[in-house]
């Protein structure tokens, strides 16, 4: 059957299948080991089995945890195996959502709608998001199915549906929720400026979601995530939130395991490097295919502000600029595929008036699209060379995007060694000993360490963590780390640390 003769319903199923298969590939290649940094945290939450720990959690983004924990309880599958199934399902749902937007909002043909779904599935930024940001992917997936409902002429039936979807979004992820609010607000502003009918029903629809989101701002987001009862925190990071506002960051003062910049140039270099890595081959196509749409353009604008505001106001910009930049893949993919379609149809020069200065011949358009797809393919399948290095990215991009999907917070080849280390600790620790836990192994500790033993979390300073252990009255302290430099993290082992257990490249050191 030719694609142009395919019905939209069958195209929708095919779009889901494409995303599912693409995301299943890295999971199969890494089997039975987990991939993704936060994946270990999700496994720990499934293993814990608790969805809401406090009444205020109803205002949090709890929905994905509720789904995963319910599935875990029903299936009794190993958490890592369950996540290897859920990750492709979420990605397939996302590519189906991309198809849904192309179909219902932009009225694109089935072939073009399938093209944007497949193109998105193989984008480096999309795969990097799906590597471990399950909440992010889940929230964005629901947002995609919501976007076609954002219409000036929405009826009351659509208003009820939009209200329900809005609640799912705000319980899904914060950036997805802010994106929804920005799109509705943008439509309102344009309606006022153009003296058009004001979309009151859109505002009515999102009122419940706004209430939940405000509850998140007041009761959840300003406070650190609750830790396990057996955890102590050293608090040796500097989060640098101006005026105590959790959603802003002073990027020239921040010092965390994820973000630390020696100068404005270092910050600029990091932002520019990540943008080039993710979108250098996508932007020319997006320029050719740029089109105007009220809600969609405001979404793209919001994500651009989140990505680059740190360069304009480095002392007070939206936090997690790297996450905002990864999210840019959603609108940019639509613009890029529209550009590729124009080039394919011989209309490369029929671009938006705003970008009339840019020209793209067919060969360049095809080459750019193929290169971006190849990068995505390498990213999801290439193994670590010597258990250390992938092929994607360079020095200051690794904090935001790994060099390959074939890893978690530790290289795949070190997964068994990590589990062995915690099994050894569970049989050799006593009530008078503690475990010093670097951020790298925090989620592994949540998952594997017996809760009768105390863990002291730190981000940068092992010596200060050791002092805290002494102050707390512990007679001995252990530390899990590599017994050789793998070039991933800045923390270096002191030569006087004594290894008491080795499993491959992972060792348990006795610090005191």
Can you say where each PLM-predicted feature lies in the sequence?
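Short, basic, helix/turn surface patches
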Residues: 466, 485-486
